[in-house]
Amino acid sequence: MDPLTFDYEKLHVRVDRGVFELFQPNDLTTTLRIPLHWLGVLVHYRKPGRPGELIFGAVNDPRTALYGTDLASFGYRSTMAVRVPSSDEPLFRAYFTEVAAHAGRPVI
């Protein structure tokens, strides 16, 4: 299977052989590499009409939804410097729905 990749602004993510990797060329200190069974992803909107925060992290329970993860389910989380307008959220949902299918994990 070829790696599943997704690019958004200066964010590059990929899944290959059960491992998720995240890269931001302008900030290599926020590179993330994590097995799919621990991955949780959420676009968190605090205020209506404002871009949301993109959150990646490790979940405590691998049966937790891979995308749309509840904030309380994260054992560790990191907010990326990427803001996601609600009009772009379906792009993330489509990619992570495909990733979740490969990992045997649900999405919300």
Task: List PLM regions with ranges.
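Short, compositionally biased strand/turn segments
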Residues: 6-28
